[in-house]
Design a protein with these regions (language model features):
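Metal-dependent phosphohydrolase cores
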Residues: 2-161
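Internal insertion modules embedded within essential enzymes
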Residues: 16, 32-36, 114, 122-125, ...
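Short hydrophobic/aromatic beta-strand micro-patches
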Residues: 296-298
Length: 591
């Protein structure tokens, strides 16, 4: 297989192997006097019609603002914004976002103001810089971390590129954790593993996700990490011989079928090996699938032809085939996944995809923008560069996928869940869960957490549908509401039209999605508050009559406003609710 170059969507002709294996943000300028050159080169390849002069201006400003600063590594501080902008350029971001990467620390760490940034570079760059700056202002304690993550979600719901810049910032900082105190590095690594890496995964940014996981794993579990490194190294020779045999046989089969492809093998990441050991309960000696094979072809038809060739040579492992081309993940990911019984009876995991799919798999939302208007707010989530719009128009494969819906759902959670720690817990739970894909009766795909139930489905469709759920059909059959849904199920919800319809507390024992759980709790909280207000009003009225006090005179709206103010309550209903809940005694109102 003599593959040398390949046209990649939105990119100039580049060497296929270099594209498939290149690490983000690691190209260093050959000219130390012009460190911006590789960034501009990559940015130009992605956005040939864009004016790149903003990059020169942003770099000059960053140099001025950071001239007296140094990193903890001892390097000039400008190294960091250059690295962040290089990562953003490699992701395919436009010059506006790359410029924001160059400037992202100026407002936070220097005397440069946001107003100055806005005047010099415009509202979009200033907005991105402001969004990233606000995410760095809370650093101490669990509650502060939870509030920071809440701010992150709000910022990315306004413009998802804020998160892309923050992820690039986190990647480069993670590469330099060895220069900071161990306790600080471990705190950042835990936050990264729990939140930032899963967020990158949800946005389809596998290259970012994988590196963040590896760097965090190394800091959090250094002993285990080093043990796995040594164990993998011991098998390296045997692994390479085995991998060479597999690649040769696949190439031979594809050549016979006249399928033009780029076939590559790679060792599994250390963190993924560790996860296999934990999930499967095996020690390293019993983990055989230490390598993965990837086949990249030109067309979807070639994907299935290559799959046929692979399965003709090796038997597939039952239950290990996934067709994410026919049913893409909601983060835009598309590929065929299969595990086969390879030479020597050892399992081999194989991914098959097109070049367009490969770019989306590595760079996710950064590679394929899908913009939508926020109907409630009447504003765009973000404004694409011209070449972003062109790329989106030319690629219709995933035109029906609304990949910003999940982000907007998170933004809704922030307003629905006042407690930041509770919100962070729900977010971690949602990010950490695997997914199941089911259908509405009209054929729309709904993504739910693994082991989700019809009640989770109902709340995913609409909150009111969830509240009014009284039954469910799965694949045409009536089922209990706690039934576990499987991939491909068609779910129909039966709802009540009664004015008194509402959820059951029992549902909290089996729902899996944070949204369903939060909505059910909110409903009962609201119901309980209404009951408490009525109970408090009745209790106060009875107490006043028992003491022969003039109810009609003392319980006027004007009088109650004064009472609430004297007792530091926001309004009269809050006073009644406190009495009804037993938080305050009616005697307080007589003094």
């Amino acid at each position: 297989m003599n593959f040398m170059t390949r046209e990649v969507t939105g990119m100039a002709e580049i060497d296929g192997e270099q594209y498939a294996a290149r690490k983000l943000g690691c190209e260093i300028s050959a000219d130390p006097l012009n460190p911006l050159d590789p960034i501009k080169k990559v940015c130009k390849s992605h956005h040939p019609d864009e004016d790149l002069s903003i990059l020169d201006r942003a770099y000059r400003r960053a140099v001025i603002q950071h001239s007296a600063q140094r990193r903890k590594s001892g390097e000039p501080y400008i190294i960091h914004p250059l690295a962040v902008s290089q990562i953003l350029a490699d992701l395919g971001m436009g010059p506006i976002v790359v410029a924001a990467g160059l400037l992202h620390d100026t407002v936070e760490d220097t005397d440069y103001t946001l107003d100055q940034c806005r005047a010099e570079f415009g509202d979009t760059v200033a907005g991105l810089v402001d969004g990233v700056t606000k995410l760095s202002q809370l650093e101490v304690g669990d509650s502060a971390q939870a509030e920071t993550i809440r701010k992150l979600v709000v910022a990315m719901s306004r413009d998802v590129r804020t998160l892309v810049v923050k992820l690039a910032d986190r990647v480069h900082n993670a590469r330099t954790w060895r220069y900071v105190k161990t306790t600080s590095a471990q705190k950042k690594a835990r936050e990264t593993l729990d939140v930032y890496a899963p967020l990158a995964n949800r946005l389809g940014m596998n290259a970012i996700k994988t590196e963040l996981e590896e760097l965090s794993f190394k800091v959090l579990y250094p002993k285990i990490y080093n043990e796995i490194v040594v164990l993998v190294a011991r098998r390296a020779g045997q692994r390479d011989v085995y991998l060479k045999q597999i690649l040769a046989e696949i190439n031979e089969d594809l050549d016979e079928q006249n399928i033009k492809a780029y076939v590559t093998g790679r060792p599994k990441d250390y963190f993924s090996i560790y996860q296999k050991m934990i999930v499967r309960g095996h020690d390293f000696a019993n983990i055989y699938d230490l390598v993965g094979v990837r086949i990249i072809v030109d067309t979807i038809q070639d994907c299935y032809a290559a799959l046929g060739a692979v399965h003709a040579r090796w038997n597939p492992v039952p239950g290990r085939f996934k067709d994410y081309i026919a049913m893409p993940k909601l983060n835009m990911y598309q590929s065929l996944h299969t595990t086969v019984v390879g030479p020597g009876g050892k399992p081999v995991e194989i991914q098959i995809r097109t070049w367009d799919m490969h770019r989306r798999a590595e760079f996710g939302i950064a590679a394929h923008w899908k913009y939508k208007e926020n109907g409630q707010a009447g504003r765009a989530l973000s404004s694409p560069d011209k070449s972003d719009r062109k790329r989106d128009e030319n690629n219709q494969e995933l035109s029906e996928v609304d990949n910003l819906k999940w982000i907007q759902q998170l933004a809704d959670w922030t307003s629905e869940t006042p407690d930041s720690n509770e919100f962070l817990g729900s977010l971690k739970e949602d990010l950490g869960s695997s997914e199941v894909y089911v259908f509405t009766p009209k054929g729309k795909i709904v993504s739910l957490p693994a082991h989700a139930t019809p009640v989770d489905f109902a709340y995913a469709v609409h909150t009111e549908v969830g509240h009014r759920t009284m039954g469910a059909r799965v694949n045409g059959r009536l089922v209990p509401l706690d039934t576990t849904l499987d991939n491909g199920d068609t779910v129909e919800i039966l709802t009540s039209k009664s004015d008194t319809a509402g959820p059951s507390r029992d549902w909290l024992s089996f729902v899996k999605s944070p949204k369903a759980r939060n909505k059910i709790r909110q409903w009962f909280s609201k119901e309980r508050r209404t009951e408490a207000i009525e109970e408090g009003r009745d209790e106060l009225t009875r107490a006043m009559r028992k003491r022969n006090l003039p109810v009609n005179t003392l319980l006027t709206p004007e009088a109650l406003v004064g009472v609430a103010d004297d007792l530091n309550f926001p309004n009269a209903d809050a006073v009644f609710a406190a009495i009804g809940d037993g938080q305050d005694s009616t005697c307080l109102l007589y003094t």
